[in-house]
Regions:
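Membrane-embedded alpha-helical bundles that constitute the cytochrome b-like, heme-associated redox core
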Residues: 1-226
């Protein structure tokens, strides 16, 4: 439930054409609260950090999580400086220009890392995308599985288009300091764009993880054969 709320809030906050300044701030506070709740609910994970072997996938997961936490802290810290509504009761703080740059960088990198985290962690979400999943499914379900695959590919393609349309790369590189809303796009379209980018990122990191796991299995078989 918390994870679903996180994903929904993150997409909504990023769809800046849909929200005005005040709703954006309050949704951002709710998003940070959901991140804290997610960390608390998964606090046992921290105990596993000192156990087990670190392979490529585990290192990648750790980097994504560490970056995501850093982005969440950066977003909230910069929001304290920039806020006019949610934290409007605070005295004016200096450094608005720097805080704005930090906020934009943390927002867009946080978005990427959040859905990279989804792709690296959630095997069940993509299980039916595998060829084996379709071949082992009952005959009546196979058309549904293939339809789901085509839908995923279509959404991912729209996500790739949206990356270009929204100038996502320049935001990630820190070349844009203000959120530029496309006022010609309807609110629903703006949400669809960010949601499709989320699907694209999750899918890419899911298959990256699958490739790394397959490579590691191949290396293990080779070492055993020797």
């Amino acid at each position: 439930m918390v994870d679903a709320a996180l994903a929904g809030l993150l997409v909504t906050v990023m769809a800046t054409a849909l929200v005005q300044e005040a709703p954006h701030e309050y949704l951002g506070v709710a998003l940070f609260a959901a991140v804290v709740a997610h960390i608390v609910l998964n606090r046992r994970w921290f105990k596993t950090l000192i156990h087990g072997r670190y392979n490529a996938v585990r290192i990648l997961r750790l980097v994504a999580i560490a970056g995501l936490v850093a982005c969440a802290v950066g977003q909230m810290a910069s929001a304290l400086v920039l806020s006019k509504f949610a934290f409007g009761f605070l005295p004016a703080l200096p450094g608005a220009a720097f805080a704005r740059r930090v906020h934009m960088l943390c927002s867009y990198w946080g978005f990427v890392l959040a859905f990279a985290h989804v792709g690296l962690q959630s095997k069940s979400l993509f299980r039916l995308m595998r060829t084996r999943g379709a071949s082992n499914a009952p005959g009546a379900l196979r058309p549904v599985i293939w339809a789901g695959r085509f839908l995923f590919v279509a959404i991912a393609c729209f996500g790739a288009y949206s990356l270009v349309k929204l100038d996502f790369g320049n935001y990630l590189l820190g070349q844009v300091q203000f959120a530029l809303a496309d006022y010609g796009a309807a609110g629903a379209l703006s949400l669809m764009r960010y949601a499709s980018i989320a699907v694209l990122i999750s899918g890419l990191f899911h298959y990256l993880r699958a490739a790394l796991e397959a490579l590691e299995k191949s290396r293990r078989r080779t070492s055993r054969a020797r």
